[in-house]
Amino acid sequence: MDFTQPKPATALCGVVSADGKIAYPPGVKEITDKITTDEMIKRLKMVVKTFMDMDQDSEDEKQQYLPLALHLASEFFLRNPNKDVRLLVACCLADIFRIYAPEAPYTSHDKLKDIFLFITRQLKGLEDTKSPQFNRYFYLLENLAWVKSYNICFELEDCNEIFIQLFRTLFSVINNSHNTKVQMHMLDLMSSIIMEGDGVTQELLDSILINLIPAHKNLNKQSFDLAKVLLKRTVQTIEACIANFFNQVLVLGRSSVSDLSEHVFDLIQELFAIDPQLLLSVMPQLEFKLKSNDGEERLAVVRLLAKLFGSKDSDLATQNRPLWQCFLGRFNDIHVPVRLESVKFASHCLMNHPDLAKDLTEYLKVRSHDPEEAIRHDVIVTIITAAKRDLALVNDQLLGFVRERTLDKRWRVRKEAMMGLAQLYKKYCLHGEAGKEAAEKVSWIKDKLLHIYYQNSIDDKLLVEKIFAQYLVPHNLETEERMKCLYYLYASLDPNAVKALNEMWKCQNMLRSHVRELLDLHKQPTSEANCSAMFGKLMTIAKNLPDPGKAQDFVKKFNQVLGDDEKLRSQLELLISPTCSCKQADVCVREIARKLANPKQPTNPFLEMVKFLLERIAPVHIDSEAISALVKLMNKSIEGTADDEEEGVSPDSAIRSGLELLKVLSFTHPTSFHSAETYESLLQCLRMEDDKVAEAAIQIFRNTGHKIETDLPQIRSTLIPILHQKAKRGTPHQAKQAVHCIHAIFSNKEVQLAQIFEPLSRSLNADVPEQLITPLVSLGHISMLAPDQFASPMKSVVANFIVKDLLMNDRSTGEKNGKLWSPDEEVSPEVLAKVYLLRLLVRWLLGMKNNQSKSANSTLRLLSAMLVSEGDLTEQKRISKSDMSRLRLAAGSAIMKLAQEPCYHEIITPEQFQLCALVINDECYQVRQIFAQKLHKALVKLLLPLEYMAIFALCAKDPVKERRAHARQCLLKNISIRREYIKQNPMATEKLLSLLPEYVVPYMIHLLAHDPDFTRSQDVDQLRDIKECLWFMLEVLMTKNENNSHAFMKKMAENIKLTRDAQSPDESKTNEKLYTVCDVALCVINSKSALCNADSPKDPVLPMKFFTQPEKDFCNDKSYISEETRVLLLTGKPKPTGVLGTVNKPLSATGRKPYVRSAGTETGSNINANSELSPSAGSRSREQSSEASETGVSENEENPVRIISVTPVKNIDTVKNKEINSDQSTQGNISSDRGKKRIVTAAGAENIQKPDEKVDESGPPAPSKPRRGRRPKSESQGNATKNDDLNKPVSKGRKRAAGSQESLEAGNAKAPKLQDGAKKAVPAERQIDLQR
């Protein structure tokens, strides 16, 4: 109801009736200050009842009781000390306002103000719902709300004071004991004031908003709810007032307008949650604030908006796209805390608003590479948290970011990424919580986590082991369940992950053996040798723990405890015992940890380190029971009753991988296999048609069957005939394993092997080469394992059959398809037999380990002849190019294998070593690749002499970037291993000449001095080649100047100049080339290091096999390279590179315009020395690079001559597709003969055919092609090319990688069809024949 101003007709203190008295209701006596309070209350109750019963239509009564109404508003009543009196008076006044509406009986504004303030104060009584008077307070509230009595105050100038007091009172008294009616009346009362007034003042708004502040909200939840509903109800009216408030504070910066200014962001959050309409005009102001120059202010706004955008029911991002985009921009804020807050928000957003994931993805991608570790860490937490809630919330791209961070440079980030992925795998793959589709989405995780085991960091390796034990194959599962998990995991891993898992078991087993050896040392009496051995063992163990520096101290302490505590030692012995079960291991670990725990030390780093050690060596997965369970699973797969298909694995794959798994475990846990049941199952596998399965089964018998002969005679009797059959007619791999198995597990092995050797040696038939492979393998391994028994019989086989009948005869004609390499299955049986024959020769010699019969010399001459003849030993031209590549690889590998035996290394001549080295520059990519891998594998195990590491220097000439990168990584690995070995082994100092990496320098210098490409010691281009090869090795050696190594290497080069070449000591040209290479090496060392001028701490020793003893009076201070040449070598100008400088890339057919790419990826083989300082180690698939181009001609084919004009390349960047002027092709003395063959006269190489000639119809006559060798090109190449050859380096002995598939990418030069006139105009055009 609305009130109007009353007529000013009555007095304030009472209008009397006709008789001059105040009229009271019947039965009510006069109410004055003369009566007692109780009496007054009694009379007021009757008055209240009277006014309560009156309505607005009672005009007579209204007039009658008007004096009473005025009397009740007197100061006596308004200030009465008794609260009951005040309550009754307030109820009366509320009814009076109701009865006399719309005209109030009070005319004075001051009196009205006093009355309403009085009524407001009485409303505080609502607080106590248990009060006897609560109903009257409720009546008062109800009356005021229904009548809207407070609206009369709008006419008062200071009505705001009344409203503020009212609002504060109501918000303060509301509590959880009030029912909804109380709340509704309060809302009605307040909302009428807001909605029907002229506006809401800031103070009044503050009285509402203060209840939304978290501190107040937590104190009185009901006042917050009341304010929330009030704001919702009055949103249309109050929104403008709220907008004005935020405008004053946010935009104008007038924080003094309100005490709540410092809480604006909290208020915005609460208001948004209540009703986004309340902030309709505020949001643009936030966009302005997001661009503030104050980082802390931006941070506050970002925190706020993160809550607004991320809240579950918010549609702010779709409703306000500009603000959303502006907010996303803060992901790239310069202020770190802002970026951090943005990333943290993403998690809630992904969970509550999956539709926004697309918008967030790109920003999270950038932040996943943030320079701040904490931000990268939180990106992972964000994505993983959302993924754990529901995998559908994150897309593959987001999971990809986590995948990337598993290789982060910071351990904390890597750990979070790895653990996060592990948790996802366990949740969705192991437990299958979201079905097969989700499991498929994260199936890659298992492979990725295991790949991390390849990282060098011990922390990464330990975490992978922990993840495997807790998430991939949880060790706390029951044995059957655990083995099922492992069985199908192993079957579904990719090859690299399988290798990593195998390596993990191998490392754990190695550490177990170290601990076992340590315990054995404890059993021996104390001595200096014992202490030294124990110290070395402790250092080895410490390297297998995190933070090896600290680990050393802890391991020493643990060793002391072991020495003092025999019971602890016995627990540890039980833990590493081959017979320890998984349950026993768990008990042992807990018992040892309990003994070492210190209750007074909550954080015990010593105990943590010991736990790391125990977790690595404890057999928590595999024991006899586990192996039995695995075998049963495999049997089910064989019988077809397993859940293979359900697990996503085919039965054949499950069987094969199951056997492979058992094979790996047979190395690490051989004792666990010893049971009849297990061996019966393996015998069943031996009878299967799958060759791989049978091979793995034999390997398992070989590794685990040492007690079969004594304990399981039935298994023995069944096994022997099967092994004999496999050795005679199985696959080559089966034959090898069968022979080794017989040798390993049977006591009468001599008899058994003789029963295989004799029939096989008699039945060899060169006319049926496909039936020769397995016999050759068996015979080779038999002669290696039992040389005393079979070395002599083998010699006659070698002389009468192997060399005479097989090697020196070509019975079949190879397919002339022009390819330099073909898949294994396409290799002809005859060539395959020859490859295995060479291996047999090597095994025979390795078994004898002596050269008393001079068989090794003959074999080395044979292998050298094979290399000189490029694989075509008979030189009848009947063998294909790809088969020749196979034989070259086999011959080079054979020499390298023999060099691993000291007695044969001594008789390998420098010429033979150089021939072997040139295989790494073979024209066939696969030959180079496989040879380099074999070389690295032998070097890294310290099996090959140090001189063989010098071969990697030749890889600088490899035209394929991946091969150079691989070679560099091999060098880094080999050098680090040798240095580490010297540090860890005190006795190694006596063998420094064969171990110290720097001692490779003289071998490298000698090898490069005899490089067939190096024919003229003053040719700048050839010297640049030499410099590149030198720097390829020296760059890795000079990374650190350990022990003044730079000066040491310089001293070696200087000392070589005081000697002569032992290979040709009297040839001045040979010695000049040697000294020239020394000068180039000195030039490189001096230019790259300022530390090489210091004196070397010791005089280096030069290998006598390659250098003569320095003569006393000989002084060689001559400089063999001019100052101009020196400058040219050091300027870094790249040598002009041939277009066909790389391997196995498509080339155009003769006369056709080649397919031209938009940009090249790399120049050819002559890359500047500084261009490969840090190459990528990745290797590209050769299948891709061997595909033919659109012209239909591919690498590894015999191609006709290509006449291609080439310009010198100025840098190693990509070469643009430009037509290159033919007259530029002569500017750079291009090494066009990189692909040509050369001659080397090796001992035993006879009947070398004369070079054949080919002339291509599309160009000038090609120079005749000399055979492979170490000498310069033959002078029989014709006068047409002699002058040109003066400016070209001669190619390497093995067809140097030249015409190849990657050459077009390297050069991208077009080859226009030459006309007759062009031939005359350009006499220096280059001819390249891929066959050479």
From Swiss-Prot:
Modified residues (N6-acetyllysine): K1145, K1210, K1288
Positions of modified residues (Phosphoserine): S1096, S1174, S1194, S1303
SUPFAM superfamilies: ARM repeat
Domain of life: Eukaryota
Residues modified to N-acetylmethionine: M1
Compartments, as annotated in UniProt: Nucleus
Entries under Gene3D superfamilies matching the protein: Leucine-rich Repeat Variant (1.25.10.10)
Signal peptide: none
Biased composition (Basic and acidic residues): 1316-1332
InterPro entries: ARM-like, ARM-type_fold, Pds5
GO cellular component terms, semicolon-separated: nucleus
Homology family: Belongs to the PDS5 family.
Biological function: Probable regulator of sister chromatid cohesion in mitosis which may stabilize cohesin complex association with chromatin. May couple sister chromatid cohesion during mitosis to DNA replication. Cohesion ensures that chromosome partitioning is accurate in both meiotic and mitotic cells and plays an important role in DNA repair.
Record text on subunit structure and interactions: Interacts with the cohesin complex. Interacts with WAPL (via FGF motifs) or CDCA5 (via the FGF motif); the interaction is direct, cohesin-dependent and competitive. Interacts with SMC3. Interacts with TP63.
Name used for this protein in its record: Sister chromatid cohesion protein PDS5 homolog A
